[in-house]
Amino acid sequence: FEPTNEGYALAKVYAAKLCEYITNSDSTFSYKTIIPCNLYGRWDKFDPNNSHMIPAVIKKIHDAKLNGDKFIDIWGDGTARREFMYAGDLADFIFVCLMRFDETPDLINVGLGLDYSINDYYRAIAKVIGYNGEFKSDLSKPVGMRQKLVDVEQLTDFGWSHRTSLADGINNTYEFYKK
């Protein structure tokens, strides 16, 4: 496990194993484990002290635009890659699983199957918000893992794919944030 995510990863493995144990021990129970990639969307936390990357960047760029800031710092060099899926797409997947429960694999990753660099996310969010300033890499800040991307081969075989584009997801999230 990657050190900064070890506790989270172990908790997911433990929960999946518990579901597997219960399902195998008693035929009246049938559990499925869905492991999503990183999520963002409406009702997210936008407080920079306890938010995930996309809502934090939305707030950061929104504030920079309002304040007329010409520069925004990006932690690290911005080349690390992350996979973020709009939360509404996960809700859709869960609904599909309920409708096709017997076909749903016991354990399945849910994601886009593609990732973007941190720089790409900043540019996409700036475009939605209408921010025209520049981004500066703060190389004194940590980069984290170079890539976080889930394997979606089983998801593809199941016949499901996300519907929300990055631009639409960011726009939906930003519109919610402005309310």
Summary of predicted features, one role per range:
Residues 63-179:
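C-terminal substrate-binding subdomain of Rossmann-fold SDR/epimerase-dehydratase oxidoreductases
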Residues 8, 51, 55-65:
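Mobile, glycine-enriched helix-loop/loop "lid" segments at the mouths of ligand-binding/catalytic clefts
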Residues 13-20, 54-59, 91-92:
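Conserved active-site helix of classical SDR/Rossmann-fold NAD(P)-dependent CH-OH oxidoreductases
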Residues 49-52, 153:
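Short, hinge-like loop/turn segments at secondary-structure boundaries
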Residues 1-40, 44-50:
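Catalytic helix-loop patch of NAD(P)-dependent Rossmann-fold dehydrogenases
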